[in-house]
């Protein structure tokens, strides 16, 4: 696991906090934040219409943040999701989403693995 400096971590936490507000405005219910497993972390777990959404929040100003979600990152997310589901509710319907924060604007990309 890579350790972030405090400034970078604070920026990420601020983006996640703003992301939660945005998601709530879209009708999502926050279930959990920063779920860790031995494989990685899920930034936000939210529920909408009976479906669990595992959401990776990415922010950036000088680049397109979606490119920070690499195939390797997705594999780690999937392993972490499996851990979460095995602990909480193995029969849940779910999807993997990305929430992009750029220049103060939000874009929710649903089902990024398809």
From Swiss-Prot:
GO MF terms on file? nucleic acid binding
InterPro entries for the chain: Restrct_endonuc-II-like, tRNA_endonuc-like_dom_sf, UPF0102_YraN-like
Q: Which Pfam families match?
A: UPF0102 (PF02021)
Similarity comment text for this entry: Belongs to the UPF0102 family.
Protein name per UniProt: UPF0102 protein HP_0823
Give the originating organism: Helicobacter pylori (strain ATCC 700392 / 26695) (Campylobacter pylori)
């Amino acid at each position: 696991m890579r350790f972030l400096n405090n400034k970078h971590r604070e920026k990420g936490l601020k983006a996640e906090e703003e992301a939660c507000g945005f998601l709530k405005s879209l009708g999502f219910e926050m279930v959990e934040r920063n779920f860790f497993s031995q494989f990685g972390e899920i930034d936000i777990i939210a529920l909408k219409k009976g479906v669990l959404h595992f959401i990776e929040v990415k922010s950036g100003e000088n680049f397109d943040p979606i490119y920070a979600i690499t195939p390797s990152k997705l594999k780690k997310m999937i392993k972490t999701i499996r851990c979460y589901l095995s602990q909480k509710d193995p029969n849940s319907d779910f999807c993997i989403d990305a929430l992009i924060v750029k220049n103060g604007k939000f874009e929710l990309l649903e089902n990024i693995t398809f």
